[in-house]
């Protein structure tokens, strides 16, 4: 009996991938991101296994082997992604060794133990509304 091409491992390299829905890619929040923020979002999304949303990290130990050298670039890109509503901080990081945890804004929250965020207040799709919120310093001129 022949093997189905759809289930064939020859169809693609590797068995893991980053799922970035078109609704996210086409959103104004994603489109407004700079190149560094988009790249960082993909590198953080790479950690998602299907059961760990809410426990993704953006620490130096994880990002340095992926080519992220500048702490300033990572900080600015991370702030940009969080402001866009694409990444939600679920646990605040603390020195000396407690990493901040994040959740991808287009997936439901999987991890609820050990997070600082109330799981009842977490909503997917916050990136859809983030583009509607004016930036700080926006004038109310007519």
Explain the meaning of each model-derived region.
Residues 1-61, 65, 109, 113, ...:
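Short recognition helix of helix-turn-helix/winged-helix DNA-binding domains
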Residues 33, 73, 80, 126-127, ...:
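Generic signature of intrinsically disordered, low-complexity, basic-rich segments
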Residues 87-103, 110-115, 128-142:
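Electrostatic interaction modules used in gene-expression and signaling proteins
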Residues 120-126:
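A recognition module on extended beta-rich or small alphabeta surfaces enriched in W/G with H and D/E
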Residues 36, 47-108:
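Winged helix-turn-helix DNA-binding recognition segment
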